[in-house]
Amino acid sequence: MKRKDRIILKTAGAMLVLLLFFFAQGAIVVIAGIEGVPSALIRGAVIWGLVIITLAYSIIRYKGISKLGFRGMEKGAVKRVLYFVPLLLIALSPFVAGVDLKGGAAFLFANLFLTLGIGMAEEIFFRGIICGLWLERGVGKAMIISSVLFGFSHLLNIAGGAELGETVLQICFALVYGMVFALIFAESGSLLPCVLLHALHDFCSFVSGEASAQFEIFLGAVQFIVLLVYFLYLFRITARKREPAMKGR
Protein backbone atom coordinates (compact mmCIF):
# COMPACT_ATOMS: atom_id res chain seq x y z
CA MET A 1 0.00 0.00 0.00
CA LYS A 2 1.31 3.44 -0.93
CA ARG A 3 2.21 5.91 1.80
CA LYS A 4 -0.50 8.35 0.68
CA ASP A 5 -3.15 5.62 0.78
CA ARG A 6 -2.13 4.77 4.35
CA ILE A 7 -2.44 8.43 5.34
CA ILE A 8 -5.93 8.60 3.81
CA LEU A 9 -7.02 5.44 5.63
CA LYS A 10 -5.64 6.69 8.95
CA THR A 11 -7.40 10.03 8.43
CA ALA A 12 -10.71 8.27 7.70
CA GLY A 13 -10.26 6.03 10.73
CA ALA A 14 -9.52 8.96 13.04
CA MET A 15 -12.59 10.82 11.76
CA LEU A 16 -14.82 7.77 12.22
CA VAL A 17 -13.74 7.25 15.84
CA LEU A 18 -14.12 10.94 16.72
CA LEU A 19 -17.52 11.29 15.05
CA LEU A 20 -18.88 8.18 16.76
CA PHE A 21 -17.98 9.51 20.21
CA PHE A 22 -19.23 13.02 19.48
CA PHE A 23 -22.48 11.73 18.02
CA ALA A 24 -22.93 9.55 21.09
CA GLN A 25 -22.37 12.39 23.58
CA GLY A 26 -24.97 14.56 21.89
CA ALA A 27 -27.50 11.83 21.18
CA ILE A 28 -27.47 10.49 24.75
CA VAL A 29 -28.59 13.74 26.35
CA VAL A 30 -31.12 14.55 23.61
CA ILE A 31 -32.78 11.12 23.68
CA ALA A 32 -32.81 11.05 27.49
CA GLY A 33 -34.04 14.66 27.68
CA ILE A 34 -31.19 15.66 29.99
CA GLU A 35 -30.30 19.35 30.27
CA GLY A 36 -28.18 21.76 32.29
CA VAL A 37 -25.36 20.60 34.55
CA PRO A 38 -26.12 16.85 34.23
CA SER A 39 -26.03 17.19 30.43
CA ALA A 40 -22.62 18.88 30.46
CA LEU A 41 -21.21 16.26 32.85
CA ILE A 42 -22.49 13.31 30.81
CA ARG A 43 -21.28 14.78 27.53
CA GLY A 44 -17.94 15.59 29.11
CA ALA A 45 -17.57 12.06 30.50
CA VAL A 46 -18.09 10.52 27.04
CA ILE A 47 -15.57 12.88 25.43
CA TRP A 48 -13.00 12.42 28.20
CA GLY A 49 -13.41 8.67 27.70
CA LEU A 50 -12.24 9.12 24.11
CA VAL A 51 -9.33 11.31 25.24
CA ILE A 52 -8.15 8.79 27.85
CA ILE A 53 -8.38 5.87 25.39
CA THR A 54 -6.40 7.83 22.78
CA LEU A 55 -3.69 8.89 25.22
CA ALA A 56 -3.42 5.34 26.58
CA TYR A 57 -3.05 3.94 23.05
CA SER A 58 -0.32 6.46 22.26
CA ILE A 59 1.57 5.61 25.46
CA ILE A 60 1.38 1.87 24.72
CA ARG A 61 2.10 2.15 20.99
CA TYR A 62 4.62 5.01 20.92
CA LYS A 63 5.92 5.03 24.52
CA GLY A 64 4.58 8.54 25.13
CA ILE A 65 2.23 11.24 23.87
CA SER A 66 4.68 13.40 21.93
CA LYS A 67 3.48 11.65 18.75
CA LEU A 68 0.13 13.40 19.30
CA GLY A 69 1.81 16.80 19.60
CA PHE A 70 2.20 17.06 23.37
CA ARG A 71 5.70 18.50 23.50
CA GLY A 72 7.37 21.81 24.25
CA MET A 73 6.99 24.77 21.92
CA GLU A 74 9.79 25.76 19.58
CA LYS A 75 12.00 28.61 20.81
CA GLY A 76 10.59 32.01 19.91
CA ALA A 77 7.28 30.58 18.66
CA VAL A 78 5.14 32.43 21.22
CA LYS A 79 6.55 35.77 20.10
CA ARG A 80 6.15 34.90 16.41
CA VAL A 81 2.46 34.15 16.88
CA LEU A 82 1.95 37.44 18.76
CA TYR A 83 1.51 35.74 22.14
CA PHE A 84 -1.89 34.42 20.94
CA VAL A 85 -3.40 37.85 21.72
CA PRO A 86 -5.93 37.80 18.82
CA LEU A 87 -7.29 34.41 19.92
CA LEU A 88 -7.43 35.50 23.56
CA LEU A 89 -9.42 38.60 22.60
CA ILE A 90 -11.82 36.51 20.51
CA ALA A 91 -12.26 33.96 23.31
CA LEU A 92 -12.92 36.57 26.01
CA SER A 93 -15.11 38.86 23.90
CA PRO A 94 -18.42 37.10 24.78
CA PHE A 95 -17.94 38.32 28.36
CA VAL A 96 -18.90 41.78 27.12
CA ALA A 97 -22.44 40.49 27.61
CA GLY A 98 -21.61 39.38 31.15
CA VAL A 99 -21.19 35.99 32.80
CA ASP A 100 -24.00 33.53 33.50
CA LEU A 101 -23.69 32.83 37.22
CA LYS A 102 -27.25 31.60 37.75
CA GLY A 103 -26.09 27.98 37.79
CA GLY A 104 -23.45 28.66 40.42
CA ALA A 105 -20.18 26.80 40.85
CA ALA A 106 -21.65 23.51 39.61
CA PHE A 107 -22.57 25.13 36.27
CA LEU A 108 -19.08 26.59 35.84
CA PHE A 109 -17.33 23.34 36.80
CA ALA A 110 -19.51 21.20 34.52
CA ASN A 111 -18.84 23.45 31.56
CA LEU A 112 -15.11 23.60 32.33
CA PHE A 113 -15.06 19.79 32.45
CA LEU A 114 -16.91 19.61 29.13
CA THR A 115 -14.95 22.27 27.26
CA LEU A 116 -11.55 20.94 28.36
CA GLY A 117 -12.63 17.56 27.04
CA ILE A 118 -13.79 19.05 23.75
CA GLY A 119 -10.56 21.01 23.39
CA MET A 120 -8.44 17.94 24.11
CA ALA A 121 -10.36 15.57 21.84
CA GLU A 122 -10.76 17.86 18.84
CA GLU A 123 -7.19 19.13 18.93
CA ILE A 124 -5.74 15.64 19.37
CA PHE A 125 -7.68 14.29 16.40
CA PHE A 126 -7.77 17.25 14.01
CA ARG A 127 -4.37 18.81 14.68
CA GLY A 128 -2.34 16.13 16.48
CA ILE A 129 -3.38 13.17 14.32
CA ILE A 130 -4.89 14.38 11.03
CA CYS A 131 -2.85 17.55 10.54
CA GLY A 132 0.22 15.69 11.80
CA LEU A 133 -0.30 12.94 9.22
CA TRP A 134 -0.51 15.41 6.33
CA LEU A 135 2.31 17.77 7.38
CA GLU A 136 4.83 15.68 5.46
CA ARG A 137 2.80 16.54 2.34
CA GLY A 138 3.09 20.25 3.08
CA VAL A 139 1.72 22.74 5.60
CA GLY A 140 -0.88 24.04 3.14
CA LYS A 141 -2.35 20.63 2.41
CA ALA A 142 -2.31 19.65 6.09
CA MET A 143 -4.02 22.91 7.03
CA ILE A 144 -6.77 22.62 4.40
CA ILE A 145 -7.61 18.95 4.95
CA SER A 146 -7.67 19.11 8.75
CA SER A 147 -9.62 22.40 8.76
CA VAL A 148 -12.28 21.30 6.26
CA LEU A 149 -12.87 18.12 8.25
CA PHE A 150 -12.92 20.15 11.48
CA GLY A 151 -15.48 22.55 10.04
CA PHE A 152 -17.87 19.90 8.75
CA SER A 153 -17.60 17.87 11.95
CA HIS A 154 -19.72 20.60 13.54
CA LEU A 155 -22.72 19.19 11.69
CA LEU A 156 -22.91 16.84 14.66
CA ASN A 157 -24.05 19.80 16.78
CA ILE A 158 -27.47 19.12 15.29
CA ALA A 159 -27.48 15.85 17.27
CA GLY A 160 -27.04 17.99 20.38
CA GLY A 161 -30.12 20.06 19.53
CA ALA A 162 -28.52 22.99 17.65
CA GLU A 163 -30.47 24.67 14.85
CA LEU A 164 -29.36 24.22 11.23
CA GLY A 165 -28.74 27.94 10.58
CA GLU A 166 -26.64 28.29 13.71
CA THR A 167 -24.71 25.14 12.79
CA VAL A 168 -23.88 26.43 9.29
CA LEU A 169 -22.39 29.61 10.80
CA GLN A 170 -20.40 27.49 13.26
CA ILE A 171 -19.01 25.44 10.36
CA CYS A 172 -17.80 28.58 8.55
CA PHE A 173 -16.22 29.99 11.71
CA ALA A 174 -14.67 26.63 12.62
CA LEU A 175 -13.14 26.33 9.16
CA VAL A 176 -11.09 29.51 9.63
CA TYR A 177 -10.42 28.69 13.28
CA GLY A 178 -9.13 25.29 12.20
CA MET A 179 -6.71 26.87 9.72
CA VAL A 180 -5.41 29.19 12.44
CA PHE A 181 -4.86 26.29 14.85
CA ALA A 182 -3.17 24.23 12.12
CA LEU A 183 -0.73 27.07 11.44
CA ILE A 184 -0.06 27.54 15.17
CA PHE A 185 0.60 23.81 15.48
CA ALA A 186 2.96 23.87 12.49
CA GLU A 187 4.74 27.01 13.71
CA SER A 188 5.10 26.05 17.38
CA GLY A 189 5.45 22.28 17.04
CA SER A 190 3.17 21.87 20.06
CA LEU A 191 -0.48 20.96 20.51
CA LEU A 192 -0.72 22.46 24.01
CA PRO A 193 -1.56 26.06 22.99
CA CYS A 194 -4.21 24.78 20.58
CA VAL A 195 -5.87 22.69 23.31
CA LEU A 196 -5.89 25.49 25.88
CA LEU A 197 -7.07 28.20 23.49
CA HIS A 198 -9.76 25.93 22.05
CA ALA A 199 -11.04 25.06 25.51
CA LEU A 200 -10.96 28.70 26.61
CA HIS A 201 -12.95 29.80 23.57
CA ASP A 202 -15.65 27.17 24.15
CA PHE A 203 -15.80 27.79 27.91
CA CYS A 204 -16.26 31.55 27.52
CA SER A 205 -18.99 30.97 24.92
CA PHE A 206 -20.83 28.50 27.16
CA VAL A 207 -20.82 30.60 30.35
CA SER A 208 -21.21 34.11 28.93
CA GLY A 209 -24.38 36.08 29.51
CA GLU A 210 -27.20 36.32 26.99
CA ALA A 211 -27.17 39.19 24.50
CA SER A 212 -29.52 40.46 21.82
CA ALA A 213 -29.47 38.84 18.38
CA GLN A 214 -28.17 42.08 16.86
CA PHE A 215 -25.27 42.24 19.30
CA GLU A 216 -24.35 38.59 18.70
CA ILE A 217 -24.28 39.20 14.94
CA PHE A 218 -22.07 42.26 15.42
CA LEU A 219 -19.75 40.43 17.82
CA GLY A 220 -19.53 37.45 15.49
CA ALA A 221 -18.59 39.70 12.58
CA VAL A 222 -15.84 41.41 14.61
CA GLN A 223 -14.52 38.04 15.80
CA PHE A 224 -14.43 36.72 12.24
CA ILE A 225 -12.54 39.77 10.94
CA VAL A 226 -9.94 39.53 13.73
CA LEU A 227 -9.59 35.79 13.10
CA LEU A 228 -9.19 36.28 9.35
CA VAL A 229 -6.50 38.96 9.76
CA TYR A 230 -4.66 36.73 12.25
CA PHE A 231 -4.86 33.82 9.82
CA LEU A 232 -3.34 35.91 7.03
CA TYR A 233 -0.52 36.96 9.36
CA LEU A 234 0.20 33.37 10.43
CA PHE A 235 0.06 32.15 6.84
CA ARG A 236 2.58 34.81 5.86
CA ILE A 237 5.12 33.91 8.56
CA THR A 238 4.83 30.18 7.90
CA ALA A 239 5.23 30.82 4.17
CA ARG A 240 8.43 32.76 4.86
CA LYS A 241 9.67 29.86 6.96
CA ARG A 242 9.06 27.43 4.08
CA GLU A 243 10.78 29.53 1.39
CA PRO A 244 14.40 28.68 2.37
CA ALA A 245 13.53 24.97 2.49
CA MET A 246 11.96 25.13 -0.98
CA LYS A 247 14.99 26.96 -2.42
CA GLY A 248 17.31 24.36 -0.97
CA ARG A 249 15.66 21.51 -2.88
Predicted features, each with a name:
Residues 1-65, 179, 203-249:
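N-terminal, membrane-interfacial amphipathic/helix-forming hydrophobic leader that caps
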Residues 8-16, 78-85, 108-112, 140-145, ...:
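Hydrophobic alpha-helical transmembrane segments
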Residues 18-26, 88-97, 115, 147-157, ...:
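Aromatic-anchored segments of alpha-helical transmembrane domains
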Residues 30-44, 59-124, 131, 135-136, ...:
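Juxtamembrane helix-loop-helix connectors linking adjacent transmembrane helices
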Residues 45-53, 105-113, 121, 168-176, ...:
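Membrane-embedded alpha-helical segments of multi-pass membrane proteins
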Residues 53-57, 117, 129-130, 176-189:
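Generic transmembrane alpha-helix motif of multi-pass integral membrane proteins
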Residues 121-147, 186-190:
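Membrane-interface helix/loop boundary segments of multi-pass membrane proteins
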Residues 167-223:
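Functionally important transmembrane alpha-helices
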